[in-house]
Amino acid sequence: NAMLKAVRIKFMLDGVIESHTAPMLQPYSDAGINGNPANSDFALPLELYRSLLNRFDKEGFQIYTHAIGDRSVREALNAYENAQAVNRTKGKRHRIEHIEQSSPEDLPRFAKLGVMASMEPIHADPGTIAVWATAVGEQRLSHSFVWASMLNHKAKLVFSSDWPACLTPDPMRGLHNAVNRRTIEGYPAAGWVPEQRISVKEALTAYTQGGAYSSFEEHTKGRIMPGFLADII
């Protein structure tokens, strides 16, 4: 009914970058330091993931895939592309969750496949990413939390908090990070990876209309207008 739906399946394809459990296309930059591994296996065997995704896609479910490392993001896109070809399905609005690292060559595939980019600006708070940034390394920082690049490639962007696995569920903090890429104290002054900052309008759209579109509710929520749900904070 309108209040309760069971129409989505979420897969955990990897872990997180801080613990080196998110598969990367290239080895972690701090491999070998304090016993850090060079890379990681997938949290779910790829063949099993692809098989289950195909099955649930065919049965009409919307699929969310937790993928943080750039290799995981690529394999998730590959799996969605395969499911569309095998099942001849389109318009499911499947999602990839988090996408903290991504290869530039994979970004156009989001719009092409109709896969939504579900990301959390609060995770890019410059005050909490020292371990993360060391693991990724300087050369890959420009590929980190690429909100602007996603929009430039016409991807559908949806923002959320990832609560309780984040600093705070407060969307105002998330909006601040998305627009400024600075801590609330103003560090760093120029912003962290500033080329990936987006406008207030773009960030607000991702937090509101993006989520509504993701759940096929863009005609009843996500905007302030007559007839829409008054989900206002």
Where are these regions (language model features)?
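Metal-coordinating catalytic core of metallo-dependent amide/deamination hydrolases
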Residues: 1-74, 78, 109-116, 122, ...
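His/Asp/Glu-enriched, well-ordered alpha-helical/loop segment
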Residues: 53-64, 71-94, 99, 104-108, ...
